[in-house]
Amino acid sequence: MAGLRRPQPGCYCRTAAAVNLLLGVFQVLLPCCRPGGAQGQAIEPLPNVVELWQAEEGELLLPTQGDSEEGLEEPSQEQSFSDKLFSGKGLHFQPSVLDFGIQFLGHPVAKILHAYNPSRDSEVVVNSVFAAAGHFHVPPVPCRVIPAMGKTSFRIIFLPTEEGSIESSLFINTSSYGVLSYHVSGIGTRRISTEGSAKQLPNAYFLLPKVQSIQLSQMQAETTNTSLLQVQLECSLHNKVCQQLKGCYLESDDVLRLQMSIMVTMENFSKEFEENTQHLLDHLSIVYVATDESETSDDSAVNMYILHSGNSLIWIQDIRHFSQRDALSLQFEPVLLPTSTTNFTKIASFTCKATSCDSGIIEDVKKTTHTPTLKACLFSSVAQGYFRMDSSATQFHIETHENTSGLWSIWYRNHFDRSVVLNDVFLSKETKHMLKILNFTGPLFLPPGCWNIFSLKLAVKDIAINLFTNVFLTTNIGAIFAIPLQIYSAPTKEGSLGFEVIAHCGMHYFMGKSKAGNPNWNGSLSLDQSTWNVDSELANKLYERWKKYKNGDVCKRNVLGTTRFAHLKKSKESESFVFFLPRLIAEPGLMLNFSATALRSRMIKYFVVQNPSSWPVSLQLLPLSLYPKPEALVHLLHRWFGTDMQMINFTTGEFQLTEACPYLGTHSEESRFGILHLHLQPLEMKRVGVVFTPADYGKVTSLILIRNNLTVIDMIGVEGFGARELLKVGGRLPGAGGSLRFKVPESTLMDCRRQLKDSKQILSITKNFKVENIGPLPITVSSLKINGYNCQGYGFEVLDCHQFSLDPNTSRDISIVFTPDFTSSWVIRDLSLVTAADLEFRFTLNVTLPHHLLPLCADVVPGPSWEESFWRLTVFFVSLSLLGVILIAFQQAQYILMEFMKTRQRQNASSSSQQNNGPMDVISPHSYKSNCKNFLDTYGPSDKGRGKNCLPVNTPQSRIQNAAKRSPATYGHSQKKHKCSVYYSKHKTSTAAASSTSTTTEEKQTSPLGSSLPAAKEDICTDAMRENWISLRYASGINVNLQKNLTLPKNLLNKEENTLKNTIVFSNPSSECSMKEGIQTCMFPKETDIKTSENTAEFKERELCPLKTSKKLPENHLPRNSPQYHQPDLPEISRKNNGNNQQVPVKNEVDHCENLKKVDTKPSSEKKIHKTSREDMFSEKQDIPFVEQEDPYRKKKLQEKREGNLQNLNWSKSRTCRKNKKRGVAPVSRPPEQSDLKLVCSDFERSELSSDINVRSWCIQESTREVCKADAEIASSLPAAQREAEGYYQKPEKKCVDKFCSDSSSDCGSSSGSVRASRGSWGSWSSTSSSDGDKKPMVDAQHFLPAGDSVSQNDFPSEAPISLNLSHNICNPMTVNSLPQYAEPSCPSLPAGPTGVEEDKGLYSPGDLWPTPPVCVTSSLNCTLENGVPCVIQESAPVHNSFIDWSATCEGQFSSAYCPLELNDYNAFPEENMNYANGFPCPADVQTDFIDHNSQSTWNTPPNMPAAWGHASFISSPPYLTSTRSLSPMSGLFGSIWAPQSDVYENCCPINPTTEHSTHMENQAVVCKEYYPGFNPFRAYMNLDIWTTTANRNANFPLSRDSSYCGNV
């Protein structure tokens, strides 16, 4: 044996380093040393010497879960395993290497490791993460799922416990890629004290506490934006310091409970509490670092560190412990944690004095303990070497000292035939500080036999440990004996708080079994017939070996050679094999007991499997029924674990297995069949769920088998109970016998006799039933149904009908109310109780009523619940309907009353006007009777379209053509018509416009009367007379009294105290306008048309143009093609008549009249310029300023009116017209359909005006605010009219005539009665302005001359009488203010403004316009001028939006004349009878009644003149004058729907020179209306004979009792 070589010392450290790496897997709180770099050399076995098991460093790398253990003795397998592990292809880590840098010893620091899943279609489950060294720690991360292309993070904690560079690896156990490694490193350094000396660092241990609960203080959450979180930390104490603390103060639950109050500022407190809690846990890390007693103190301390990585502020307010002992001392100061840091902050420290720990409970435990606290394994074999040695040749025994804890005696039994020398005993470096070798003095000579070689003592006391290590012995034979040990802490049997340390030997042979040792185990996973063979063989070997260990003798021999053989005393209790085996069940002896479960329901319970070894373990879990030979296996388990075979069900399939953390909610393929395959890394734990689905009622017991390669077989018991839900209601079971009876005594129904029928009291019977849960399962009744209806039905109702739960053997009362309807004496219904498990319990509700009392009680049964609501709704809607009828009736009555009041007002205005007017020159009554009667005989009377103040005298029964189309509601009362001449014209003008122009003129007239205008202005009407008017020639000695018949609007005088008088003097009676040759087509029926003499003499002085009033008309400052002009600028003046709102634009008329007055201001010296060509007129016209001429002229006119002698216009006041005054119908204006209001002004003005003319005699009464509407319609095709803008007159060639575009309306002054009579009929005579004529008050009449002839006073001497031949003529009176200034298209139905118009806008107040004078139209009316000049009736050119107040004229100065038609009643004349071949681009041209015989007729317009409404057609049309009105709402857009189309009057209106002279001339000019085809979508025709029927019956009947016609008497 000489020459025995001793192995190199490095080989010992090599093996110790390998064991050290294994210890790091368990994360025990033991100081772990870095695997020594100097221990690089492996054990070099000597030749012919036993080779010990050598632990290579690469062998510490763990295999994947898919592979079983690699043979530790096969280098090729080890190398392939290492390559597979370090591939790292499964996950990508960031950063690639984690370096913590320099950290102080004992001070933890944390960093985040990010793991990315690069797979696009699969997810990765991270089962666990652990470190190989004790310096690095990872909080538990069970079942962390990394989605595809997703990432997760781990917090790695570095706690250095020794100086120098520390490098290690993290192992990430994944489900898809196995175990992946990751490199981590750090450097530990000591803290240097102020004296410069290094402190001695005591041993430090790392603990991760468990956060038990987090509670939120609601009071704090409501008052502030912060939340107070109560965090309870539960920590299992597994080190020496905690063990000492535990002995001081802990109870039997083995935990140290701490409560920490934290104030956290939440960014979004509105989140759910769970979200806030999870957010806090994700960013808050709490660790404990326990230290041993230091050199300066005997106290052990536990330091608490907190790391906060979030952004919110955390204030640690308080920390408390729940210890009942006084030995624990807590040091804490409130601290504000920094945010987003990596270093931990120390917040508290716990200390416990050793003196307290040595006394008390520890001593009590020792006194009550009768068995050794340390138990030794009996045998440990030496690993096989090269020599064929029996493993039993060398045996090591561990003797436990009964009275000493943590001390073992190691015995060596030498079976060799020679002696062995033990040279040295050493431990691995990792366990040097935990274990100490005692009683080994040096090399020992050991002959064959049993020898006590040394003692092993556990250096740490009262700590919970779980240690795997080896004790190495070197010998003189070159062999190194390795004694494998497992030392762990276990609770004492007495259940005390102390732990006992157990040392096992020899189990390493089975733990970490390689494929070479178990070649068939992996093949047995298929669960075929070989499975039982493999399991039984391995189990028998393990069991027999344990028996040898248990029954082996222990020899005691001292080292001096004395030999003593003695048997070791047997322990009082035979140790079982179960206690010997390391169990895979975390709780040995656990029985999963499933409570009562309903059929077809599933209940899941979980248990935990744990790998107690330092090597990976493969598990196969399956129910007993799936094992190939369950009976044989149960018999084996009975021997091992003492299982009761009688209670085991071998075939039940009611138990299945599932993972506690399933992958995406699904199980693996094996789990579907109840089989699970798990791979556990060292110390790894997993939860496994057992699903119990009872198939039948009753109890069932079975086993869950755990096949593994560590202990071969393990098991856990399961027990379940299948039960059913069962209810009783009223003591009866559900089904046929479950009848619940309602007892209704007869005395109860006798109350029906005492109840009144009106009381309608509900008779009901209530009964309570007890619902009992007689089954083992808790029942939740989700709903109660009566014949399928929830809670009530068929008279039954369950009170407090809501969901309730019943535990087993509990009950609850329900109340059911029955309300009979007394239709049947026997009522049977079903009551169903539906549970949350969809079980339905059916019972029968049975009610019997006395049959003879049913009729008596049926009377007191109330009606349905909705009956009262139905009647209330009915009454409500009927009341609403009645209220609506009342409102409509009230509105109609108010409308009638307002109409009546307006009529009275107009009568008062008429009377006042007639009283204020002086004597006037009127045509004799004989002329009226002869002429008007002939006219009426031809056409008959009509009450439609009459002017205002003319009462209807006849029903419209004699209407011929379209009478059938009119409303059947035609008034049948007698309508007495006044004598008024009628002016047949298509267009009408608005008195509102006229009044507005008057108001503006009053302010703007600053120019003197004598101021001259350029020639272009004077020639404006020259062409107008040639093209559009038949000039009426007056005798040279025309009487100036003619001026007296022309008056100005009353409201013009209002601005001058309502007494201003203005007289316009005609400078030359011989003024004339040339008339082109051609036949004049009048707007009169053919019977009244007279061919005009073509050789009519011209006026000698000037062409007749409308004479301007005393107030100058304002200029038009507007562009001519601006349809939007009227809407915003024109004030609205609305008056309602017959339900029609009339709106009057006034500003345009103001502008038109202003321009007319400009024309009038031209001196007589410039009259000859009118005879120049049209081209000159056009060119010169645009440059005429106007504003500067206004004020002087106005003042002059006002002065004339004040000083002048007004003649009393002695008009023939007939009785009929007086009656018209009494009517006083309020004027209603029609909405304009043209944007430009052509105001027709007369050049004639009476020299004297009565100073007391009532304001009410004007078109617009200030008292009633009645407004006459002007037509705003202008043909868009007027090129000349488009050149009028900014106060200038632009006159194109041959287009000087003022154009009056038809608004297609027939507002001819029809009375309100006739309008109502014809409302609603297509053939009606009413329109939207059906009462224009009716609503206009009495106004003085005016006459007009063409704008080019500003006739002075010298033209018509005051004494010269004028005789007009009005045989077939219709008066065409036009107000001065009703001539539009410009022509521009406008939207129809423009709104009108209020009567009070602002004067600064150039608008006349509505009451300041003069009404138009009436012109008599009779069958043989002659008006002879003094000089014999014939006066030819001239067709007035269509005036755009012009207004002529005929009715006002009749009631005013022409009181005895019939109310004339007004220009805004032009629509009364059919366009079929008008020829509108000429546009009116010259707004200054004003129509006149005096037309020179030589002036060209406008009916023969030159071909170069564009037609406003179409081409001029001279066709012989029927003698129809369709003075129709329409109530159609579209009349505001297109005018009357009976607007005339293309018919033309071919007759002229000649003047009969033999007409007798009237002393008081009413109409100085009669205008023949030129026809312009208008827009009429319906082409309606109206026979004029409807006006003449009455006149035919009565020869003395006035001209036309219809107000649309005016005749002179």
UniProtKB/Swiss-Prot annotation:
The keyword Signal applies. Residues 991-1000, 1304-1331 have a biased composition (Low complexity). Residues 696-916 are annotated as: Required for Wnt-signaling inhibition and LRP6 degradation. Residues 946-974, 991-1014, 1108-1144, 1159-1178, 1304-1340 are annotated as: Disordered. Residues 1-40 form the signal peptide. The chain crosses the membrane at residues 870-890. GO terms for cellular component: cytoplasm; endoplasmic reticulum; plasma membrane. It comes from the Eukaryota. Glycans are attached at N343, N439, N522, N593, N709, N846. GO terms for biological process: negative regulation of canonical Wnt signaling pathway; negative regulation of immature T cell proliferation in thymus; Wnt signaling pathway. Its main location: membrane. The modification Phosphoserine is found at S1122. Residues 952-961 have a biased composition (Polar residues). Expressed in thymocytes. Pfam families: Ig_TMEM131L_2nd, Ig_TMEM131L_3, Ig_TMEM131L_4, Ig_TMEM131L_5, TMEM131_like_N. PANTHER family: RW1 PROTEIN HOMOLOG, TRANSMEMBRANE PROTEIN 131-LIKE. This is Transmembrane protein 131-like. It comes from Homo sapiens. The gene is TMEM131L.
